[in-house]
Amino acid sequence: MRNFQGKRIPVETIDKILNLALRAPSAGYTQGWAYVVVTDQKIRRKIGELQGESDFYAKRKHKFISEAPVLIVACISEQLYHDRYREPDKLKNDGQEIEWTIPFWYFDIGGACTIIFLATVNEGLAAAFTGIFRQQQMKELLGIPNHFLPIGIVSIGHPKKDVKSSSHRRGPRSSKDVIHYDRW
């Protein structure tokens, strides 16, 4: 969904959605995420500008960032994970922090954003996600602390008639191509 009505969304609804996201699983119960909820129209427009909305998204005729009544900027702190995994119950037998072969912080924020999507739909609303292209400028605009990284924007609003994007028209991959039991 990339086309929203401009109708206001009550703060209570956004709080309900985000409180569900706080229940997402996280490595070591670190919960290294934070969210900036943007409802101010001027700030939403600035975010749209940072994202290159007028160039890239204008081709689709929908400004789904600046025109969405609510933007949730999802942020993650790698530092909080390192801090948590230096605590006694998470150290390896040799007393050292684990080696992060997979950056769990990205997995965790992805799971939390999925819950935001599901909770949004459950409220009769629609959501769209986009990555952040100019992270440093976004941090400055929103006053995000240095140890947090803004990784994505969830645009939320009441759905408006939408035209399917070329990505959506591709359709999903076949379940037989992606689900494997016991062995690949």
Identify what each model region corresponds to.
Residues 21, 27-30:
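N-terminal structural module
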Residues 14-22:
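Short amphipathic alpha-helical segments
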